[in-house]
Design a protein with these regions (language model features):
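Conserved Radical SAM active-site core
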Residues: 46-101, 105-119
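Conserved Rossmann-like nucleotide-binding pocket used by diverse enzymes
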Residues: 25, 29, 72-74, 161, ...
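Short, flexible, glycine/charge-rich loop motifs used to bind or transfer phosphoryl groups or to couple energy/partner
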Residues: 15-16, 28, 61-62, 108-112, ...
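N-terminal pre-core extensions flanking Radical SAM catalytic domains
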Residues: 1-47, 64
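Short strand-loop junctions, especially beta-strand C-caps/beta-turns
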Residues: 43-45, 76, 163-167
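Radical SAM enzyme [4Fe-4S]-AdoMet core and its adjacent flexible, acidic
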Residues: 94-97, 116-119, 123-226
Length: 226
């Protein structure tokens, strides 16, 4: 039953109990990615070896046994893994409300994950070539939109959110276009902001794309008015 309603009722019940359960088990299943986003924390770690599938399945199984309620599977680009559907199945079978984060390139070529996934976050920072340029991946905007359309038809039980990263590489007009697309497609939209915070020396590329706090404040005032 925890897969119904986004697990909201169980989350509320857990928070109100004397022994609340841990909420979300976050797992980076690969560092590999076909994009080269300037604001990515992990772009310099693409050569790192991936955790074996068997180890990932063990961790997810134990997370379920411990009492975790949700999982979020991410990367890199998790759909690069040809065994990703098996990983999602392990999370689902462990009783976890299973979420994934993807750049959307492989949504149609590696689609089997969806039958075990409750919620998918897909990155879309602008519409058309502007998004391709931000992700340094020609054609990815078309792949995202086509992939979303595909899963709306073939995976109707999986909830879809669009994730728009706010940075120096996006402007309000581009964000408005993403918001219009989401409204027309009846998809929920949320925003992320990447900040290097305590490790600026390890993420100089992220620092270079950060908006100043005042700029962020002004941007989100405009976003709130959409």
């Amino acid at each position: 039953y925890k897969h119904l309603g986004g697990g909201a009722l169980e989350c509320i019940a857990s928070r109100l109990s004397k022994t609340p359960k841990p909420l979300c088990f976050s797992l980076m299943v690969t560092s590999k990615c076909n994009c080269d986003c300037d604001f990515c924390f992990w772009k310099h770690k693409k050569g790192t070896d991936d955790m074996p599938k068997e180890e990932i399945i063990r961790l997810l199984t134990e997370a379920g046994q411990i009492g975790y309620m949700d999982s979020i599977l991410w990367g890199g680009e998790p759909l690069i893994r040809q065994d990703f559907a098996e990983i999602c199945k392990a999370s689902h079978d462990a009783g976890l409300y299973t979420k994934i984060a993807t750049n959307g390139w492989y949504l149609e070529t590696n689609p089997d994950f969806a039958q075990y996934t409750d919620l998918m976050f897909v990155s879309l920072d602008a519409i058309g070539k502007a998004h391709d340029d931000i992700r340094h991946m020609p054609g990815i905007c078309d792949k995202v939109i086509s992939g979303i359309d595909y899963h709306k038809i073939h995976s109707p039980k999986m909830r879809i959110y669009v994730c728009c990263t706010v940075s120096t590489q996006t402007n309000f007009e581009q964000i408005k276009e993403v918001a219009k697309y989401c409204k027309d497609a009846d998809i929920l939209l949320y925003f992320t902001v990447n900040k290097a915070a305590s490790i600026p020396e390890e993420a100089e590329n992220v620092v270079a794309t950060e908006l100043e706090n005042e700029q962020l404040s002004q941007m989100f005032v405009k976003i709130k008015e959409l």
